[in-house]
Amino acid sequence: TDPTKNLEINYEKDTQKAVTKFVDPSGNPIPGVNNIEETGKSGEPLTKATEVTTEITKLIAKGYDLVSNNYGKDNNGNFDKDSGKDQEYTVVLTTHIQDVPPFDSTNPNDPNTPKPGQPIDPENPTGPKWTEELIKSLETTKHVNRTISYVKEDGNKVEYTDKDGNKSTADVTDKVTFTRPAKINVVTGTIEYGKWTPVNN
């Protein structure tokens, strides 16, 4: 080599790899979702932003809520210069839990009754919809008929004044309604209930 001449050195950027994972808040992979992998040269822009966004949109349509997404938040959205390890990005999602107010399935005019085809989560119109089977599986209201008898210790009926002001010894039939709140996992369809409480006595 002639030391009096300029020496031209071609520098080739290292090839880097980035992996985007889709997990729940505990770090477990979201079922049925593959990692998104990409390769590129150090300092060059990441290339899978659209694919990551598309996957998030699909999962929201399945009933997931987006918790966080750090894709491209480091290195100004570029591949890093560390060939010793892959760049890792994490998209965290959780299954949406929707409150279901009590409704009376025997009352066709109850405004709380879900309707087939309506989104389970009203704020996610593209998400999973109510089905007849799912609606029928809900039990948030029940009616109990009870009979009250007024008797003495010797077993004889006690005379009392009924609601119309008349004297009576007849048994009284009373209907009590109980309701309980429900929560449904929009992704799995799993339903959890609260405690039964009486609406009237």
Descriptions of predicted regions:
Residues 1-22, 78-145, 149-151:
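Conserved "repeat-terminator" motif of extracellular CCP/Sushi domains
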Residues 21-30, 148-160:
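Structural motif
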Residues 24, 44, 152, 184-186, ...:
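Acidic/polar residues at beta-strand termini and the immediately following turn/coil
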Residues 157-165, 183-185, 189-193, 197:
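Mature extracytoplasmic or otherwise solvent-exposed domains
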Residues 30-40, 68-74, 102-107, 159-177:
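Short, tandemly repeated low-complexity microdomains enriched for cysteine and small residues
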Residues 2-4, 38-49, 82-86, 117, ...:
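Solvent-exposed, conformationally flexible loop/turn segments
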Residues 1, 50-82, 191-201:
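Surface-exposed interfaces of beta-sheet-rich extracellular modules
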Residues 22-23, 39, 73, 113, ...:
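Hydrophobic alpha-helical segments, especially N-terminal targeting/anchoring helices
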